């Protein structure tokens, strides 16, 4: 892709996520059946947090594209570094994680993650927008341009910190309301929940490492010299 095409692509995807972040909170806002969905805000759902994260990332990517064209430089240190850090440590791992875990649980027993009653409010296209297209967009981004990964120690630490923050949010929500964010937790005993969280982090960390490998496989010759310049 040319720089102009890449910029247009980032702009279109950015606006797609802006639309989703605006539209989804309005669904069934005054409907008593969706009261639990709206109570506590979007921060209790990893899927909705990810949509916000995607909007931020593609906004930064679009800004990076525009500034490079205006200034005429290949690299704008702070913006480009922020873009790459967001993508490598959060956007790629979390989007892939949501896709894998959601659809695995959905086809095993959808009541554990996405009860059938939600179909009345969230049409199929919106379900796929939240849980399927997110993977498509990050894979396109991986192929579209190289991303400079931090050290494994830093990358996994940042990912782990975000995992811990979200787990804390889930547990705090349960302690305040007695309701689990996702039905799957209600089917597990305390040990099962601990194991579930551990497995989720291991999966997230594995996805991070796979993303790094894919990036190196596709862009290794391009990325290496730039990474050496940072030293």
From Swiss-Prot:
It is a multi-pass membrane protein. The chain crosses the membrane at residues 8-28, 46-66, 86-106, 124-144, 155-172, 191-211. It catalyses: 9-hexadecanoyloxy-octadecanoate + H2O = 9-hydroxy-octadecanoate + hexadecanoate + H(+); 12-hexadecanoyloxy-octadecanoate + H2O = 12-hydroxyoctadecanoate + hexadecanoate + H(+); 9-(9Z-hexadecenoyloxy)-octadecanoate + H2O = (9Z)-hexadecenoate + 9-hydroxy-octadecanoate + H(+); 12-(9Z-hexadecenoyloxy)-octadecanoate + H2O = 12-hydroxyoctadecanoate + (9Z)-hexadecenoate + H(+). The keyword Lipid metabolism applies. Its EC number is 3.1.-.-. InterPro entries: ADTRP_AIG1. Signal peptide: none annotated. Residues 29-45, 107-123, 173-190 are extracellular. Its main location: membrane. Residues 1-7, 67-85, 145-154, 212-231 are cytoplasmic. One of its GO terms (biological process) is lipid metabolic process. The record marks 47, 131 as: Important for catalytic activity. Keywords: Cell membrane, Hydrolase, Lipid metabolism, Membrane, Transmembrane, Transmembrane helix. Belongs to the AIG1 family. Expression was reduced after castration and reappeared after testosterone treatments. Hydrolyzes bioactive fatty-acid esters of hydroxy-fatty acids (FAHFAs), but not other major classes of lipids. Shows a preference for FAHFAs with branching distal from the carboxylate head group of the lipids. Regulates the expression and the cell-associated anticoagulant activity of the inhibitor TFPI in endothelial cells (in vitro). This is Androgen-dependent TFPI-regulating protein. It comes from Mesocricetus auratus (Golden hamster).
